[in-house]
């Protein structure tokens, strides 16, 4: 990682990083809850399991933690982490859509659309938190 002369790489302690990751999980889970409620109100099937809190909160936590691990690896090994995450994050979000498309039969367009939005919301909350507690430069 190259830094401008006089710049110092910012490193946060593990408790700060943990707090940021937990905050991202909470914020993303609340946003997911709003999306799930809106989708159910708009006609998504009531029995569509991915729109149940137990499902999306768990998967949100898994995604945010996995993203934090990936972010830490990118920070450590990439010569230009900003450039890498600029294409890597959107690519991974789009790839994460694939399993949701397989659920059209169960969730319909509204249910699956809500899931796709949830992926974007989780990624946005996570990247915001990672940039605060694990800056790339």
Residue ranges and their predicted role:
Residues 1-15:
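Short, Lys/Arg-rich, polar N-terminal cytosolic tail immediately upstream
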Residues 8-12, 69-85, 127-137:
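Cytoplasmic membrane-interface segments at the C-terminal ends of transmembrane helices
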Residues 16-28, 121-137:
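Membrane-water interface at the C-terminal end of transmembrane alpha helices
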Residues 17, 49, 65, 72, ...:
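Internal alpha-helical transmembrane segments of multi-pass membrane proteins
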Residues 18-22, 26, 57-61, 85-90, ...:
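Hydrophobic alpha-helical transmembrane segments
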Residues 28-37, 64-72, 97, 123-128:
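Transmembrane alpha-helical segments of multi-pass membrane transport proteins and ion-pumping complexes
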Residues 48-63:
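A loop-to-helix transmembrane entry motif
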Residues 98-114:
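Membrane-helix boundary connector in multi-pass membrane proteins
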């Amino acid at each position: 990682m190259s830094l401008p002369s006089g710049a110092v790489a910012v490193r946060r302690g593990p408790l700060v990083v943990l707090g940021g990751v937990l905050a991202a999980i909470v914020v993303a889970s609340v946003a997911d809850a709003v999306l799930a409620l809106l989708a159910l109100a708009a006609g998504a099937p009531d029995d569509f399991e991915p729109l149940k809190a137990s499902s999306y909160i768990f998967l949100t936590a898994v995604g945010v933690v996995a993203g934090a691990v990936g972010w830490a690896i990118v920070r450590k090994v990439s010569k230009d982490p900003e450039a890498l995450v600029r294409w890597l994050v959107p690519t991974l979000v789009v790839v994460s859509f694939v399993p949701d498309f397989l659920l059209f039969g169960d969730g319909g367009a509204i249910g699956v659309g809500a899931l796709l939005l949830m992926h974007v919301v989780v990624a946005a909350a996570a990247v915001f938190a990672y940039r605060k507690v694990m800056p790339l430069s």
